[in-house]
Amino acid sequence: MNTAMAGSLESMDCLVVVSESERGSGVSLSLDGANVARFRSSMEAIVHKVIDSNPMGLRDLEIRVQDHGALDIVLEARVETAIARLRGES
């Protein structure tokens, strides 16, 4: 199973780990961090927006986000980068 990551565990950032999952399994999303209880729905929407706009059509993914106060735009960029790395883009 291929895995890629983007981000860090520094303050105001997040670590996103994306792995391929079994075909037909869909997206499994795990969010962790102090702000998740308050911003879960917003964070989920951002991740799903990136997945839906994925030009390669990757749909069977396991995504883990460890949040440390990242802004929405940072989370979006980290998810995009991790998916690009999973596809083999630099």
Label every PLM stretch briefly.
Residues 1-90:
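N-terminal intrinsically disordered, cationic/polar leader segments
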